[in-house]
Amino acid sequence: MAHKKAGGSSRNGRDSHSKRLGVKRYGGEIIRAGGIIVRQRGTQFHPGDNVGIGRDHTLFAKVDGKIVFAVKGRMNRRTVAVIPS
């Protein structure tokens, strides 16, 4: 009887799905209240005027308006604001 010894099982073969992070609306674009501006891990971008921050650090518009990105303060923080239209 021909026998073949069992091959070892690999410990590879797993991968996580991409999380689709990043800037969703850019400076100068018009956005509706509740619209997502940035999806991020941690605060790469900080909320400015009329921008809220979600539990997962997502930045969203609180009012309808135009998006403005800026670098502010001593720490050169990147902020996102919405100017009401």
Curated annotation (Swiss-Prot):
GO terms for molecular function: structural constituent of ribosome. It holds the Pfam family Ribosomal_L27. Keywords: Ribonucleoprotein, Ribosomal protein. The keyword Ribonucleoprotein applies. PROSITE patterns: RIBOSOMAL_L27 (PS00831). One of its GO terms (biological process) is translation. Signal peptide: none annotated. GO terms for cellular component: cytosolic large ribosomal subunit. Residues 1-22 are annotated as: Disordered. InterPro entries: Ribosomal_bL27, Ribosomal_bL27_CS. Belongs to the bacterial ribosomal protein bL27 family. This is Large ribosomal subunit protein bL27.
